[in-house]
Amino acid sequence: MAKIISFDEESRRALERGVNALADAVKITLGPKGRNVLLEKKYGTPQIVNDGITVAKEIELEDPLENTGARLIQEVASKTKDVAGDGTTTATVLVQALIKEGLKNVAAGINPVSLKRGIDKTTEALVEEIAKVAKPVEGSAIAQVATVSAGNDEEVGGMIAEAVERVTKDGVITVEESKSLTTELDVVEGMHIDRGYISPYFITNNERQTVELENARILITDKKINSIQELVPVLKKVARLGQPLLIVAEDVEGDALATLVVNKARGVLSVAAIKAPGFGERRKALLQDIAILTDGQLISEEIGLSLDTASIDALCTARTITIDKENTTIVAGTTTKPEIQKRIGQIRKQLEETDSEYDKEKLQERIAKLAGGIAVIKVGAVPETELKDRKLRIENALNATKAAVAESIGPGGGKTLIYLASKVDPIKAYFEEEEKIGADIVKRALEAPLRQIADNAGEEGSVIVSRVKDSDFNVGYNAATGEFEDLIAAGIIDPAKVVRSALQNAASIAGLVLTTEAIVVEKPEKKPAVPADPGMGGMGGMGGMGGMGGMGGMGMF
């Protein structure tokens, strides 16, 4: 395919146009008075959202050069979401400001490499400063973080705080849609496994890049599965039940994996596979833990069970299973508390008998996974558009809360960034001249999120920024009330991890844009209009597709 090549100032300006197109649509959602964005869907009703990452993912520009710039911003938002779980809109506003100021200086003849070096050195120093001023989160502050991230929804904030209290800060909390109109919290048996899907072709939710299975069966084995023939008896039994299947094995490869992927794609089977956690003897023990938790059996030849003779009762059950590229969360389908307590007792006995610190740590981890359970927040609302938006808000709040617990907190509402801007001058004192300009670019960009929060609230951003600069560390602008007050006392808090990730990712992408000298993109092909063919005759020629019946072509049924 032919390529479009763009050089120098032209290439950078095209990137900037793409950056601005996406950032302008995202930044209006920032803050407690952020505006909504209506997203048209190819199928179904339009979606009304107030969530930066959701808006960013939906945008694709017609011009391929500009679209490259938009995709860079999507990368910033996505990376921040992956690392911190929140702060995507803040990261977008920061990177737009960095690129805007940076390109002005590049156009004026400043060396872009020196600018990038100044931006990188300043960012590195500011990250250390964030760690110094952050305070540990505890007690009511957990609910405050969740409330702010959920759009000042106190009910959600309290629910997330209760979930953290019930399963501990290291526990697993999931969010799912409820069939009722109310949002409620439930703690159930379940487990978090640090293994993701073997193949991305198992994905069922393309937007989230996850596998989501409901009312599923689980095949747990310590075997490595290479041939599909080993799985045929089990697959037949599960297919008759019409339930999804998760395979947990040492590995699934060769024609076994290929056949599963093909039949999942054809809709013949709803199936996914993950590798078993752990190694050696510890792996078998972990698999046995999962089997007990999910009311099934470990299929192992060591105990006289094989795949071809396994009954449907040997398969485990799960209410829901969620798998991403790195982790799997299983919510158990039935209550097996006596068996779980018995298993925990066995592990505690091993814990008492071992002298190895490593073994003690791993045994304690197993007890925590079995005893901790999973907190499930069931989101209810009508209509469907409100349900989706509410679920997004709760997921954002949950992610922000986890980030706050992990790396402490600081004042929110853009105040921490304003404080960091005041630290730039002493940081740049030993920089070279053009590097100092890079530091100044960071300093100005750090004001952009607060300015945008104020603009979205209908205030003059520059006036608000000026007043906040002259305030004490904890004092800032509460856009929800229009007051200047102690933000931490008011519950307006930013997790340090969110601020750090937003700044680091924004600086990284901005540096790439400033040092870009050429862009190579594919030239869009003009598709010729296809005239209607009067001889199509009702598409009768499709009758030959009748041979796709089930898995017959693969020898499975």
UniProtKB/Swiss-Prot annotation:
Subunit field text: Forms a cylinder of 14 subunits composed of two heptameric rings stacked back-to-back. Interacts with the co-chaperonin GroES.
PANTHER family: 60 KDA HEAT SHOCK PROTEIN, MITOCHONDRIAL (PTHR45633)
EC class (word): isomerase
Pfam families: Cpn60_TCP1
Name of the protein described by the UniProt record: Chaperonin GroEL 2
GO molecular function, one term: unfolded protein binding
Annotated residues for binding of ATP: 29-32, 86-90, 413, 478-480, 494
Compartments, as annotated in UniProt: Cytoplasm
Reported function: Together with its co-chaperonin GroES, plays an essential role in assisting protein folding. The GroEL-GroES system forms a nano-cage that allows encapsulation of the non-native substrate proteins and provides a physical environment optimized to promote and accelerate protein folding.
Catalytic activity: ATP + H2O + a folded polypeptide = ADP + phosphate + an unfolded polypeptide
Keywords on record: ATP-binding, Chaperone, Cytoplasm, Isomerase, Nucleotide-binding, Stress response
Top-level taxonomic group: Bacteria
EC number: 5.6.1.7
Source organism of the structure: Anabaena sp. (strain L31)
Any GO BP: protein refolding
Record-stated family: Belongs to the chaperonin (HSP60) family.
InterPro entries registered for this protein in UniProt: Cpn60/GroEL, Cpn60/GroEL/TCP-1, GroEL-like_apical_dom_sf, GROEL-like_equatorial_sf, TCP-1-like_intermed_sf
Induction and repression of expression: By heat shock under nitrogen-fixing growth conditions. Induced within 5 to 15 minutes of the start of heat stress, levels peak after 1 hour and expression continues throughout the period of heat stress. Repressed by heat stress under nitrogen-supplemented growth conditions.
GO CC annotation: cytoplasm
